[in-house]
Amino acid sequence: MNPSHGGDDKQRPAMYPQVDQSIPDNPFASTNPYVASSPYLYPSLSSHNLGPNLFPDHGDASNDQSPSAPPQATEEVLIRVPGAILNLIDKSYSVELACGDFTIVRIIQGQNIVAVLANVGNEIQWPLTKNEVAAKVDGSHYFFSIHPPKEKGQGSGSDSDDEQGQKSKSKSDDEILNYGLTIASKGQENVLLVLDQVLRDYSCFTEQRMSEKAKETGEEVLGNSVVADTSPEELKGERKDVVEGQCAAYWTTLAPNVEDYTHSTAKMIASGSGKLIRGILWCGDVTVERLKKGNEVMKNRLSRAEKEKDVSPETLRRIKRVKRVTQMTEKVATGVLSGVVKVSGFITGSMANSKAGKKLFGLLPGEIVLASLDGFSKICDAVEVAGKNVMSTSSTVTTELVNHRYGTKAAEATNEGLDAAGHAFGTAWVAFKIRKAFNPKNVIKPSSLAKSVSELKAKKGSK
């Protein structure tokens, strides 16, 4: 209140002390006369004097939206190859996992490629990264290796079989999953050339060839004629059973060789050598015993009950892990596309400051700026935390039934982990609930990220 205003102020003293209008920091004055007549107490600061924006908001349109609006994300199909069969490569029996179109999609958020995912028949998914092997054996056969994410803190990890398996062998074959992809390649030669280029761009790709000795010795099992002479349309008809039997026999025969190759290649990639084993493939050492095993698988068309007996406990554990990898990719795709997680150059800023997030991002801030499968796993972890926080209070979540092919034991393994935090992520209403419950302000502090980037540059400069 200004005592100089109004006649009543002359009749009685003011209730409050008079404010000196010459004080430059006067919050009550509409204008500050001191500023016009005297220099500033503090130097002016121009935006041109500031450094570059380390944390830009991609897309100007997002600035006009509410804080809870998800960042723009798109899914782009890079290639679709019909007539594909996917097997889990295993020494005892290479179980068929899916049949249908083989699709590679790219998920883009803003200017960043967040993930590249491979999918067969909309049943099995896995990420393609530069530190995971993708190998071409011939015109119809490819195999992929992936290191499944660590299963710490997951509910499904309490399974007694899993615990026993993990205790018995810390460095087991189960640490690497090997997928065998067979393509009905008749009439698809040009499409496969494009596929090879996509794999070169987004994975650790190498072309191999089988030795002539292996081809001659195991022509019936390792031959390519059945699949090469089958088109995607023919795979939907009577030839499907024949091709499926050939696929199971082929990958069962080569299972030990594939595992040896992927393990040795993984060590090379981890060491940073950047070199791959090229030339005549390990298939020159296919043993007579393995060829006999392949012949048995191909000739004996097992019933459902017989298949169940033939699936070993190790195979069951691998099937469970295959499902978890699929769920991981679904969570990343759904989380990014629905706005649950915002990713900037593989920096996940959604849950990092929460207690659960700090447990997941134990390396923050020094090693959070990561690419490849490790960065992909961290994105998945952030979505996992967000999803579990919402789903733990929901009593209405139901799970899908899975089309099981290999008896009750294999079915139980396949169904493992299909709970509220798993396949339920595929429904739109769940994604909406997660987005609604998500706190968009709970992000990594810019100072932490700036420190992380500077430390990373310092390390590179010292090398």
UniProtKB/Swiss-Prot annotation:
Pfam families: Senescence. Residues 19-31 have a biased composition (Polar residues). Residues 1-12 have a biased composition (Basic and acidic residues). One of its GO terms (cellular component) is plasmodesma. Signal peptide: none annotated. Residues 1-31, 52-74, 146-172 are annotated as: Disordered. Residues 269-437 form the Senescence domain. Coiled coil: none annotated. PANTHER family: SPARTIN (PTHR21068:SF43). This is Senescence/dehydration-associated protein At3g51250.
